Swiss-Prot record:
Keywords associated with the record: Amino-acid biosynthesis, Cytoplasm, NADP, Oxidoreductase, Proline biosynthesis
GO annotation terms (biological process): L-proline biosynthetic process
UniProt-recorded name of the protein: Gamma-glutamyl phosphate reductase
Enzyme class per UniProt: oxidoreductase
Location in the cell: Cytoplasm
Length: 428
């Protein structure tokens, strides 16, 4: 089990520098590790998580108790809490990653030049990855497994609220590395709650870190983006929109709206704003809102909606830019697909948006004009998930445009290099 480092200041600086050196030392052997060894490690990790389920639950109980005493929100506690089912899902996710094709060494493209040079673009590991996250202990397993499959050492800095849970999961990951003969330093968990550790990671650990992936709230991601001296895959808040077009099937719209908001309110793919075409307000609006209220959702509505649906609170300007992560949704009437696109492009965090429609022209316009990482048609926003995309798992949903966008899975954790084969050519 991870030994907690309780000192701070210069001790934290030295601790993080050592973690960085060890991760960098693990980079080369991991980059050339055979697929069979990586898969063996992953399967051993999954087995260890199942075998140590009670240890993980006991550690999580400590975190949950501390969170309750601290008065953390219900949505935060939902993200923090582990159950036997969630632990099994964690293990299953690692097994799915083991079954994925190894991207390292994959030839993306190949061509021959007129002078006979044969050129290949080949996938390679990114290098040492730093993941900074908050309350979700399952990120420890997902990030560790994904980075391993892609041949990247990873330094995990979880939230202090979930440190006991993350440490118990990390012990299982190390057990898997040992079983496969891979470097134990390939997956390291920062063993301190000292916030200075994050600052050291943002500085790059003396050149040890190649990329940082933040997974958390707006303040965390904002700090990482403003202070990081290494590239960042930004996972911004999920201000996700669900638009009900005039051509939408009502039964489908009701079912998807309830699922998109209420299946799990604390996930980044939960719908936070419902937009309804004014043309079907008289037929679609109230049935959808009735279903949401029956499911326990609080409605924050614009003035037009309040005229026909009374069991709601008036929406303010802040509602359109709020990631509730709770059983609350903002609702607005818009002038058709054009009004929906205008609202989304104004207020979206460019994470995930969905349209419910039978009109193919409306769908194509939605897909073509909205610049978000994930767009869905006639499906819940809660499918915005690497596992649901067949990636086994994800580290996060990248909302930027550089390198990775959307679910960050194994393939997105690679870069590439060029291999050029000649037969004695010299440049004239």
């Amino acid at each position: 089990m991870l030994k907690l480092h309780e000192k701070s200041g210069d001790d934290t600086v030295a601790l993080m520098a050592d973690i960085g050196r060890r991760a960098r030392a693990a980079a080369r052997p991991l980059a050339i590790a055979p697929t069979a060894a990586k898969n063996a490690a992953l399967l051993a990790m999954a087995d260890a998580i199942v075998a140590r389920q009670q240890d993980i639950l006991d550690a999580n109980a400590i975190d949950v108790s501390n969170g309750e005493e601290a008065g953390l929100s219900a949505s935060f506690m939902d993200r923090l809490k582990l159950t036997p089912a969630r632990i099994r899902a964690m293990a299953d996710g690692i097994r799915e990653i083991a079954e994925l094709k190894d991207p390292v060494g994959d030839v993306i493209a190949a061509w021959e030049r007129p002078n006979g040079l044969r050129i290949e673009r080949v996938r390679t590991p990114l290098g040492v990855v730093g993941v900074i996250y908050e309350s979700r202990p399952n990120v420890t397993a997902d990030a560790g497994a994904l980075c391993l499959k892609a041949g990247n050492p990873v330094i995990l800095r979880g939230g202090s609220d979930s440190l006991n849970s993350s440490a118990a999961i990390h012990a299982c990951l190390v057990e898997g590395l040992k079983a496969a003969g891979l470097p134990e330093d390939a997956i390291q968990l920062v063993p301190t709650t000292d916030r200075a550790a994050v600052g050291e990671m943002l500085k790059g650990l003396g050149g040890a870190l190649d990329v940082i992936i933040p997974r958390g709230g707006k303040s965390l991601v904002g700090r990482v983006q403003s202070e990081a001296r290494v590239p960042v895959f930004a996972h911004l808040e999920g201000i996700c929109h669900l638009y009900i077009d005039r051509s939408a099937d009502l039964d489908m719209a009701v079912k998807i709206a309830v699922n998109a908001k209420m299946r799990r309110t604390g996930v980044c793919g939960a719908a936070e704003t419902l937009l309804v075409d004014r043309a079907v307000a008289s037929t679609h609006l109230v049935p959808i809102l009735d279903a949401l209220r029956a499911a326990g959702c609080e409605i924050h509505a614009d003035q037009e909606v309040l005229k026909v649906f009374f069991d709601a609170k008036p929406a303010t300007d802040a509602d359109w830019v709020t990631e509730y992560l709770d059983a609350i949704i903002a609702v607005k009437l818009v002038d058709g697909i054009g009004g929906a696109i205008e609202h989304i492009e104004t207020f979206s965090s460019h994470h995930t948006e969905a349209i419910i429609a039978e009109d193919p022209k409306a769908v194509e316009r939605f897909f073509n004009e909205i610049d978000s990482a994930i767009l869905l048609h006639n499906a819940s926003t809660q499918f915005a998930d690497g596992g649901e995309f067949g990636m086994g798992a994800e580290i996060g949903i990248a909302t930027g445009k550089m390198h990775a966008r959307g679910p960050v899975g194994v393939e997105q954790l690679t870069s590439f290099k060029y291999r050029v084969r000649g037969s004695g050519q010299v440049r004239p």
